[in-house]
Each structure stands twice: as structure tokens, then as C-alpha cells.
Amino acid sequence: DQDIYGQRLGFDGTSIVLEWETIEDNNGDGIDDFPNGGIPIATAVGNQSSQKVTYYSEEYSVIVWQDERYGSSPDIFATFLDEDGTPAEAYPIDGLPIVSSHDIDGVQQYSDLYQHKKPRVKANADGAFIIWNDFFRPDASGNIYIQKITHENNGVWDISSELIFDGIAVSEEYGEQSNSRLTLDGNGGVYVVWENSENEQKDIKIKHLDSDGNSTFDSDGLSICSADKDQVSPLVRKDGNGGAF
């Protein structure tokens, strides 16, 4: 199994200090096997990987990851930790699903398992926005989905999915959408950019969603560059005035 651990770093005026302590004695010999090893964040069965973390508020940070606790087809999970490393009240140990092919008890919802991969997260005190690559749709080539969560709710935006835990589509165009990035707009919304693979060529597209998950652009986003050959590796940053670079 591959698990996720975390450590909070502080500064005492002269040096970096480790704020979180845990004792892990796997051998029963009274000796800490991982001194200064941080605290467990996700240690469920299976692999937990592709983790991302960001500041949420003065009270919490938010962590998201790719989770295979229900098998080799990964889901996306998240948790909120306070300054002591304690999860928010609404989030149990090992987090809650953001998108999953299973219900809260781990019961598979479909005969086929679908993959949800490579989460990313940006946040402010109003909520955290999580994007991921989603392989639930019919062409299975990979689309981009998003969900807004808070320390009290692991799915703020309403969904029309057959899944219990899911998000809303950023893009469901034919072909693959990948290598997505996001940034906050400063007004409660979010910008998302990605590589759009269509007609054997990669272009760059962008989409803006407001705080309620409504798109202010075309349903599948706006084209940033569709010149001949491939355009790859997009990045996006807010401009401080509600727009983005």
C-alpha cells in the first residue's frame, strides 16, 4: 500500500520546526519507526497518491488525492486539517469521496469501474475547487470535471450524474481533455485551462465558472490557441481584477 502522510512546518525565529508529532511502532519494540515522520492523512487499503494541498482558511488546509481503496480504478478523496492536524468535523479519518464509482459504504454502483485521476485544488475561505480527469463518459478518452467543497460539505454544487459522488463537466468535447490547471478569479469563481485533443492536434482552451458552478463562457470553453501543430502545458493565474492570464 502507498499512503499519504503530512507534516506542518513552523518557524521559531531562528530555524524551521516540525509542528506535528506521531509515534509509529510497527515492530512492538517501543521505538518510533519514523521519527519526525508527520501524521497519517490517508492510510486506507490500496494506494493513495497524486496528492495536492493548499491553504483554505486561517483554520484549515485542504488536501486532495487519488485513492484506490476500492480497487485499481481510482477515485478522488479529500479532507480538511486544522493547525493541529485534526480533520474537520464533517470529514472522517481517511477523508471523504469527491467523485467515486462507489457509495459511502464502498458498494460498487455499476458493473464497470470508472477511473478518476490527477486531482488539483485551489481554495479560499468560501470553498475549495477540485478538478480531475474523468473517464466515466462514453468515449472514455478523458474529460475534465470540477466540484466545489467546503470543510462542512464534500459536494457543494448540484450534480446530474448517476453517481452519488461526482462533479460537473468543465468539458465533455469529443477527444481527450488533459493537463488541466486552475486559478481563483477573486470573486468566488474559478478559471480552468487545459489541453484539448481533437483532430489529432492539441490546442489550449479556457473556461470560467462562477461561485455557483455556472459557466460564463461557451459550454466547452473558449479557444486560447489553435495554431497548427500542438499547443501544450497551459498555466493560468488570476490578474487581480477578476480576469486571468
Ranges and model annotations:
Residues D1-F245:
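Extracellular, repeat-based ectodomains that mediate carbohydrate processing or recognition
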